[in-house]
Design a protein with these regions (language model features):
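Short, solvent-exposed loop/turn segments at secondary-structure boundaries
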Residues: 150-155, 215-217
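Active-site beta->alpha N-cap acidic-glycine motif
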Residues: 52-150, 164-170, 177-178
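Helix-enriched interaction subdomains in cytosolic or periplasmic regions
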Residues: 38-59
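Soluble catalytic domains of enzymes that build or remodel membrane lipids, polysaccharides, and related
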Residues: 159-164, 173, 194-195
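Extended hydrophobic secondary-structure segments that form protein cores and membrane-embedded regions
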Residues: 180-183
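His/Asp/Glu-enriched short active-site or ligand-binding loop at hydrolase and phosphoryl-transfer sites
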Residues: 193-218
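N-terminal Sec-pathway targeting helices
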Residues: 2-16
Length: 218
């Protein structure tokens, strides 16, 4: 919310450090953003939707903001590309019986993952949240109501979207939530990244997405 695990169509699995998948902006816009990256600032044309563009085979994808530009806001979409490592992440917006089998598969293969959960998922599935935490997975913040965060202009409103999930997680597990944040639908702007950093969050995008939100195409 599964990417490329066809059994699990309701959760988005994103693979960082994988081959590219085009999302959001057109390739021309991505190229323009990368060409302008010498300034070290995220270009205004990159704001709104997180987007990726293909390079040659075997090369990491190009985002509409570079790793260096994102890093100044504690934001990421790639890890160390010299290492053969992937990061499994799931955006969990609702539950239809697939999360437990995903956790079973991860446990079988001793594969840790990160689950970015929204408010209704965490409040309606406390047993799954506890299991994620107990089995060594990261539970990250995907906001309380899954809004277009790029339209949120104040720190107060931004904080409100994150604090509800934090509070639910602590109530369920007795622990503080890891401050990892994924913008719903990948919609963001530079001010959002600054707000997330001010609140102590790392923002995580993706380098490959399995398009499972089109359920009829699975």
């Amino acid at each position: 919310m599964s990417r490329k695990i066809k059994l699990f169509p309701c959760l988005r699995v994103t693979l960082l450090l994988a081959a590219a998948f085009l999302l959001g902006r057109a390739a021309a816009q991505v190229t323009s953003s990368v060409a302008a990256s010498h300034s070290g600032q995220i270009q205004s044309s990159a704001e709104g939707n997180w987007g990726l563009g293909f390079q040659e085979e075997g090369r990491p994808p190009v985002g509409n903001a570079t790793s260096q530009e994102l890093a100044q806001y504690d934001a990421f979409y790639l890890g160390d590309t010299d290492k053969k490592r992937i990061y499994l992440t799931f955006d969990a917006g609702y539950e239809n019986g697939n999360t437990a089998p995903i956790l079973d598969a991860l446990k079988k293969h001793e594969a840790p993952a990160a689950f970015f959960v929204v408010g209704n998922f965490i409040s309606e599935n406390p047993d799954l949240i506890r299991r994620m935490e107990e089995e060594g997975h990261i539970v990250g913040n995907h906001t309380s109501t899954h809004p277009d965060m790029s339209r949120i202009a104040t720190l107060e409103a931004f904080r409100e979207e994150l604090e509800g999930v934090e509070a639910s997680y602590k109530e369920i597990t007795g622990k503080e939530m890891t401050r990892f944040y994924r913008p719903p639908q990948g919609k963001y702007n530079v001010e959002n990244l600054k707000m997330a950093k001010e609140l102590g969050y790392h923002t995580f995008f993706w380098s490959l997405a399995y398009v499972d939100w089109y359920q009829d195409d699975q």
